[in-house]
Protein backbone atom coordinates (compact mmCIF):
# COMPACT_ATOMS: atom_id res chain seq x y z
CA UNK A 1 0.00 0.00 0.00
CA UNK A 2 2.82 2.38 0.90
CA UNK A 3 4.60 1.52 -2.35
CA UNK A 4 1.50 2.38 -4.37
CA UNK A 5 1.12 5.66 -2.48
CA UNK A 6 4.80 6.51 -3.09
CA UNK A 7 4.56 5.77 -6.82
CA UNK A 8 1.37 7.81 -7.08
CA UNK A 9 2.98 10.77 -5.31
CA UNK A 10 6.05 10.54 -7.56
CA UNK A 11 3.92 10.53 -10.71
CA UNK A 12 1.92 13.47 -9.43
CA UNK A 13 5.11 15.46 -8.81
CA UNK A 14 6.38 14.68 -12.30
CA UNK A 15 3.13 15.87 -13.85
CA UNK A 16 3.29 19.05 -11.79
CA UNK A 17 6.86 19.62 -12.93
CA UNK A 18 5.65 19.78 -16.56
CA UNK A 19 2.58 21.93 -15.86
CA UNK A 20 2.51 25.01 -18.10
CA UNK A 21 1.09 27.05 -15.21
CA UNK A 22 4.38 26.56 -13.36
CA UNK A 23 6.10 28.73 -15.99
CA UNK A 24 4.24 31.87 -14.97
CA UNK A 25 6.53 34.51 -13.49
CA UNK A 26 9.92 36.13 -14.10
CA UNK A 27 12.96 33.86 -13.96
CA UNK A 28 16.63 34.80 -13.83
CA UNK A 29 20.00 33.06 -13.63
CA UNK A 30 21.99 33.00 -10.40
CA UNK A 31 23.74 36.34 -10.97
CA UNK A 32 20.30 37.89 -10.34
CA UNK A 33 21.33 40.95 -12.31
CA UNK A 34 19.39 40.38 -15.53
CA UNK A 35 15.60 40.80 -15.47
CA UNK A 36 13.00 41.33 -18.14
CA UNK A 37 11.03 44.56 -18.04
CA UNK A 38 11.88 48.27 -18.20
CA UNK A 39 15.16 47.80 -16.34
CA UNK A 40 16.60 46.00 -19.38
CA UNK A 41 14.91 47.74 -22.33
CA UNK A 42 13.88 51.40 -22.29
CA UNK A 43 11.13 51.49 -24.89
CA UNK A 44 10.72 55.27 -25.08
CA UNK A 45 14.44 55.89 -25.66
CA UNK A 46 14.79 52.63 -27.60
CA UNK A 47 17.86 51.62 -25.60
CA UNK A 48 19.09 48.39 -24.05
CA UNK A 49 20.43 48.88 -20.53
CA UNK A 50 23.60 47.04 -19.55
CA UNK A 51 23.27 45.02 -16.30
CA UNK A 52 26.14 44.73 -13.83
CA UNK A 53 26.73 41.05 -14.68
CA UNK A 54 25.86 38.71 -17.54
CA UNK A 55 22.82 36.47 -17.27
CA UNK A 56 19.49 35.38 -18.72
CA UNK A 57 15.90 36.17 -17.80
CA UNK A 58 12.58 34.82 -19.05
CA UNK A 59 9.04 35.90 -18.19
CA UNK A 60 5.81 34.07 -18.94
CA UNK A 61 2.20 35.18 -18.46
CA UNK A 62 -0.87 33.07 -17.89
CA UNK A 63 -2.44 34.20 -21.18
CA UNK A 64 0.46 33.08 -23.40
CA UNK A 65 2.89 35.99 -23.60
CA UNK A 66 6.64 35.82 -23.03
CA UNK A 67 9.59 38.17 -22.73
CA UNK A 68 13.30 37.32 -22.68
CA UNK A 69 16.48 39.23 -21.88
CA UNK A 70 20.00 37.94 -22.58
CA UNK A 71 23.34 39.43 -21.64
CA UNK A 72 26.08 37.10 -22.88
CA UNK A 73 29.82 37.09 -23.18
CA UNK A 74 31.37 35.60 -26.33
CA UNK A 75 34.93 34.30 -26.10
CA UNK A 76 37.55 35.80 -28.39
CA UNK A 77 40.04 33.08 -29.51
CA UNK A 78 42.46 35.70 -30.88
CA UNK A 79 42.51 37.58 -27.56
CA UNK A 80 40.90 35.64 -24.68
CA UNK A 81 41.26 38.64 -22.37
CA UNK A 82 39.00 40.68 -24.65
CA UNK A 83 35.59 38.99 -24.97
CA UNK A 84 32.69 40.40 -26.93
CA UNK A 85 29.31 41.08 -25.39
CA UNK A 86 25.75 40.72 -26.67
CA UNK A 87 22.55 42.17 -25.26
CA UNK A 88 19.37 40.67 -26.73
CA UNK A 89 15.72 41.36 -25.96
CA UNK A 90 12.48 40.19 -27.52
CA UNK A 91 8.89 39.38 -26.60
CA UNK A 92 5.82 37.79 -28.14
CA UNK A 93 3.62 34.75 -27.59
CA UNK A 94 4.39 31.20 -26.51
CA UNK A 95 2.74 27.80 -26.59
CA UNK A 96 3.40 24.61 -24.65
CA UNK A 97 2.77 21.36 -26.54
CA UNK A 98 1.48 18.15 -25.00
CA UNK A 99 5.03 16.75 -25.02
CA UNK A 100 6.24 19.63 -22.84
CA UNK A 101 8.07 21.53 -25.58
CA UNK A 102 7.88 25.34 -25.57
CA UNK A 103 7.60 27.43 -28.73
CA UNK A 104 8.42 31.16 -28.63
CA UNK A 105 7.03 33.35 -31.41
CA UNK A 106 8.43 36.89 -31.09
CA UNK A 107 6.97 40.12 -32.44
CA UNK A 108 9.37 40.67 -35.32
CA UNK A 109 9.62 44.48 -35.24
CA UNK A 110 10.15 44.77 -31.49
CA UNK A 111 13.26 42.65 -30.81
CA UNK A 112 16.58 44.42 -30.20
CA UNK A 113 20.25 43.36 -30.16
CA UNK A 114 23.37 45.25 -29.11
CA UNK A 115 26.73 43.77 -30.10
CA UNK A 116 29.81 45.17 -28.39
CA UNK A 117 33.46 44.47 -29.17
CA UNK A 118 35.18 47.02 -26.90
CA UNK A 119 38.72 46.05 -27.88
CA UNK A 120 38.23 46.68 -31.59
CA UNK A 121 35.59 49.41 -31.79
CA UNK A 122 34.58 52.42 -29.72
CA UNK A 123 30.93 51.88 -30.63
CA UNK A 124 28.50 48.98 -30.30
CA UNK A 125 26.21 47.88 -33.14
CA UNK A 126 22.47 48.18 -32.39
CA UNK A 127 20.07 46.21 -34.60
CA UNK A 128 16.66 44.57 -34.65
CA UNK A 129 16.50 41.01 -33.35
CA UNK A 130 13.94 38.35 -34.23
CA UNK A 131 14.55 34.70 -33.38
CA UNK A 132 11.83 32.05 -33.15
CA UNK A 133 12.85 29.57 -30.49
CA UNK A 134 11.97 26.04 -29.43
CA UNK A 135 12.80 24.38 -26.13
CA UNK A 136 12.37 20.62 -26.14
CA UNK A 137 11.20 20.39 -22.53
CA UNK A 138 11.23 22.03 -19.12
CA UNK A 139 10.91 21.16 -15.45
CA UNK A 140 10.16 23.27 -12.40
CA UNK A 141 11.39 22.14 -8.99
CA UNK A 142 12.90 23.38 -5.74
CA UNK A 143 16.67 23.79 -5.77
CA UNK A 144 17.90 22.27 -2.48
CA UNK A 145 21.08 24.35 -2.49
CA UNK A 146 19.52 27.78 -3.06
CA UNK A 147 16.14 26.88 -1.52
CA UNK A 148 14.48 28.58 -4.50
CA UNK A 149 12.05 27.51 -7.19
CA UNK A 150 14.15 26.59 -10.23
CA UNK A 151 13.27 26.47 -13.92
CA UNK A 152 15.23 24.01 -16.05
CA UNK A 153 14.93 24.67 -19.78
CA UNK A 154 16.27 22.29 -22.42
CA UNK A 155 17.26 23.53 -25.87
CA UNK A 156 15.81 22.16 -29.09
CA UNK A 157 18.54 19.51 -29.13
CA UNK A 158 17.90 18.47 -25.53
CA UNK A 159 20.95 20.17 -24.02
CA UNK A 160 20.27 21.90 -20.68
CA UNK A 161 20.41 25.66 -20.34
CA UNK A 162 21.74 27.47 -17.29
CA UNK A 163 19.14 27.05 -14.51
CA UNK A 164 16.94 30.02 -13.72
CA UNK A 165 15.28 30.92 -10.44
CA UNK A 166 11.90 32.49 -9.75
CA UNK A 167 12.30 36.24 -9.14
CA UNK A 168 8.77 37.64 -9.50
CA UNK A 169 5.27 36.24 -9.66
CA UNK A 170 3.34 37.85 -11.31
CA UNK A 171 6.06 38.56 -13.88
CA UNK A 172 7.93 41.84 -14.35
CA UNK A 173 7.44 42.70 -18.02
CA UNK A 174 6.94 45.45 -20.54
CA UNK A 175 3.55 45.71 -22.29
CA UNK A 176 2.90 42.45 -24.14
CA UNK A 177 1.58 44.00 -27.35
CA UNK A 178 3.59 45.58 -30.21
CA UNK A 179 5.79 48.41 -28.92
CA UNK A 180 6.49 50.33 -32.12
CA UNK A 181 3.84 52.92 -31.28
CA UNK A 182 5.67 53.66 -27.99
CA UNK A 183 9.20 53.99 -29.40
CA UNK A 184 9.93 57.68 -29.87
CA UNK A 185 9.95 59.07 -33.42
CA UNK A 186 13.52 60.31 -32.92
CA UNK A 187 14.67 56.81 -31.94
CA UNK A 188 12.95 55.33 -35.00
CA UNK A 189 14.51 57.91 -37.34
CA UNK A 190 18.06 57.10 -36.24
CA UNK A 191 17.64 53.40 -35.59
CA UNK A 192 19.16 51.94 -38.77
CA UNK A 193 22.52 53.66 -38.22
CA UNK A 194 22.55 53.63 -34.45
CA UNK A 195 25.87 53.05 -32.71
CA UNK A 196 26.27 53.26 -28.97
CA UNK A 197 28.95 53.09 -26.29
CA UNK A 198 30.18 49.48 -25.85
CA UNK A 199 29.84 47.51 -22.62
CA UNK A 200 32.37 47.65 -19.82
CA UNK A 201 34.85 44.78 -20.08
CA UNK A 202 34.51 43.77 -16.41
CA UNK A 203 30.86 42.79 -16.88
CA UNK A 204 31.57 40.30 -19.64
CA UNK A 205 32.91 37.54 -17.38
CA UNK A 206 30.56 36.25 -14.68
CA UNK A 207 29.82 33.06 -12.78
CA UNK A 208 26.91 32.26 -15.10
CA UNK A 209 29.26 31.98 -18.08
CA UNK A 210 31.68 29.73 -16.20
CA UNK A 211 29.02 27.02 -16.22
CA UNK A 212 29.75 26.45 -19.91
CA UNK A 213 32.67 23.96 -20.09
CA UNK A 214 33.75 25.35 -23.46
CA UNK A 215 34.81 28.56 -21.73
CA UNK A 216 37.02 26.96 -19.07
CA UNK A 217 39.98 26.77 -21.48
CA UNK A 218 39.95 30.52 -22.15
CA UNK A 219 39.42 31.36 -18.49
CA UNK A 220 42.48 29.23 -17.66
CA UNK A 221 44.57 31.02 -20.27
CA UNK A 222 43.54 34.43 -18.95
CA UNK A 223 44.24 33.48 -15.33
CA UNK A 224 47.63 32.01 -16.26
CA UNK A 225 48.54 35.19 -18.09
CA UNK A 226 47.45 37.32 -15.13
CA UNK A 227 49.52 35.12 -12.80
CA UNK A 228 52.57 35.59 -15.00
CA UNK A 229 52.16 39.37 -14.95
CA UNK A 230 51.83 39.36 -11.16
CA UNK A 231 54.97 37.23 -10.80
CA UNK A 232 56.92 39.52 -13.11
CA UNK A 233 56.18 42.62 -11.04
CA UNK A 234 56.72 41.03 -7.60
Swiss-Prot record:
Known InterPro entries for this protein?
A: Rot1 (IPR019623)
Q: Which residues are glycosylated?
A: 130
Those parts of the protein on the Lumenal side are: 18-215
Does Endoplasmic reticulum show up as a keyword for this record? yes
Q: Name one GO molecular function term.
A: unfolded protein binding
Bilayer topology reads: Single-pass type I membrane protein
Membrane-side (Cytoplasmic) residue stretches: 234
The cellular component terms of Gene Ontology attached to this UniProt record, alphabetical and capped at eight, are:
endoplasmic reticulum membrane
- What Gene Ontology terms for biological process does this UniProt record contain? 'de novo' protein folding
Parts of the chain that traverse the membrane:
216-233
Give the main localization category.
Answer: endoplasmic reticulum
In which compartments does the protein localize?
Endoplasmic reticulum membrane
Q: Where is the signal peptide?
A: 1-17
The record's keywords, sorted A to Z, are: Endoplasmic reticulum, Glycoprotein, Membrane, Signal, Transmembrane, Transmembrane helix
Q: Which PANTHER family match?
A: PROTEIN ROT1 (PTHR28090:SF1)
In the record, the note on similarity to other proteins reads: Belongs to the ROT1 family.
Q: What is the protein's known function?
A: Required for normal levels of the cell wall 1,6-beta-glucan. Involved in a protein folding machinery chaperoning proteins acting in various physiological processes including cell wall synthesis and lysis of autophagic bodies.
> What protein is this chain from?
Protein rot1
The source organism is Emericella nidulans (strain FGSC A4 / ATCC 38163 / CBS 112.46 / NRRL 194 / M139) (Aspergillus nidulans)
Q: Which gene encodes it?
A: rot1
Amino acid sequence: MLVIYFIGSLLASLVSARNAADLIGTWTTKSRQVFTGPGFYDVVKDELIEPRLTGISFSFTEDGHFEEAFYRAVSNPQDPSCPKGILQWQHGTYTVDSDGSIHLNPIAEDGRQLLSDPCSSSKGIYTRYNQTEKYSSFTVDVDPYYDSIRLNLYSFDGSPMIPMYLAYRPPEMLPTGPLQSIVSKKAKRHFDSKKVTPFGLRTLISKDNLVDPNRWLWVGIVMSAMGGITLFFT
